[in-house]
Amino acid sequence: MNGPAVHPESGTDRTMTAIPPDAPFLSIGFSARELCTRCGSCAGVCPEDAIELDERKFPRLIPDRCTRCGLCEAVCPGAEVRFGELSEQVFGRRNGGGGFDGQVAKTYVGYSTDDRLRSGGAGGGMVTALLWHLLRTGEVDGVLVTRMNRERPWEAEPFLATTYEELVASQGSRYAIIPMNVLWRELRRRPGKLAAAILPCQTHGFRRLQKADPELAGRLTAVVGLFCGGSLEPVLAREMLAVRGIRRGAVADFKFRGGDWPGQM
């Protein structure tokens, strides 16, 4: 397998090219580390759990486990985005206008009729309400979303929600890089259908998964796309605590934005 790679030991921004077949490191489909969106697709798709994520959420290989199947490279969204092909894959036709709007059938403005979801959401609770409807009606058996870690509440993490209360805990914006697609592992480990609320780069990885492993991707039956203006480094929350002189052990909860919509930073 030839191409650029992330070295499993160095953890640097160096990339390797022209990888020999017996090289003890991973060939991943991005030409430089700065193109890695840290979506977690490579780690999530690996059937051998041969890819882990470092503290900054970059992929790192466990060489002894790697079978060189190539799935990690096949699903990586970092190298390029072909909007025309994506549109044709999802909607059966390419964009007519050539812009970034995509295929828009109709535009709506709304909010959740559940007061708790409406007040706790980043913008009216529509995403959570839709996901709860899918879960409550049995359309899906779980939902891939995010939350703040219970033991380390300054760290955001992806998780599988299966109850109303877990969905409530997932509400709100988290301004940090969260490798959502590592949860593809759940598609292999548990039966049933799942939904996901994911960002564009993560969705791009999923579309590539649909081509690389249609059977596995078919388990994720509903995708709710979220807007994104960019994500901040995972260390941001820790740095904010340090600037304010707050000990991590004293933190019971961490919210990037609190109060009723639109909230306060």
Give the location of each predicted region.
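Ferredoxin-type iron-sulfur electron-transfer modules and their immediate structural context
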Residues: 2-45, 49-52
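Iron-sulfur cluster-binding cysteine motifs and their immediate structural context
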Residues: 18-19, 37, 41-61, 71-92
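Immediate flanking context of iron-sulfur cluster ligation sites
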Residues: 26-34, 57-67, 191-195
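Residue-level marker for well-ordered alpha-helical positions
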Residues: 30, 40, 60, 70, ...
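Alpha-helical architecture
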Residues: 38, 68, 199-200
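Glycine-rich loop at the start of a catalytic domain that most often binds anionic cofactors/ligands
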Residues: 66-71, 158
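Iron-sulfur-associated redox domains of electron-transfer enzymes in respiratory
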Residues: 85-265
